[in-house]
UniProtKB/Swiss-Prot annotation:
The keyword Signal applies. Residues 1-30 form the signal peptide. It comes from Treponema pallidum (strain Nichols). It comes from the Bacteria. This is Uncharacterized protein TP_0150. Keywords: Signal.
Amino acid sequence: MTYNTNTSLSSYAGLSAFALSVFCILWGTARTGSFLKEKALITCAADILARQAPELGVTSRTLRMVPSSPIPQAEVLRGKKNTGEEIFLYFFPLRGMYGSFPTLFLYDKKDGARFCHLIGNHPTPRDARFYGISSARIALQCRKIEHLHQTVAYE
């Protein structure tokens, strides 16, 4: 091997090692971020359900993330009630008078879809109408969720 060939091979090897290390760092960051996001959503949903619907008996141990949501900009959790029935929790951003607010919806086969609560660090928990989210918009999201469960089968 000549000196020029050796120099170019070592520079290509260095560049390849750098590119591989950047890829591994980005991949690790994305995996860690998705794990932390899933953990935060599960904790948030369990806390809200413990306050809003304690009769369901849903805990963070029974909630799991659905891998791919059929609705854009929504996260879906699947869980079980204390009776063993399956429920779905939907995190939607809903547009209100003061911007977009994350909300939580609950779906079960018996009762259909219902609005649970706004999510976030609001100083005082208030009704969604206070933030400009109308009951018609909430009812529309509930109908979308019910239609989704009639047309899409979750694994």
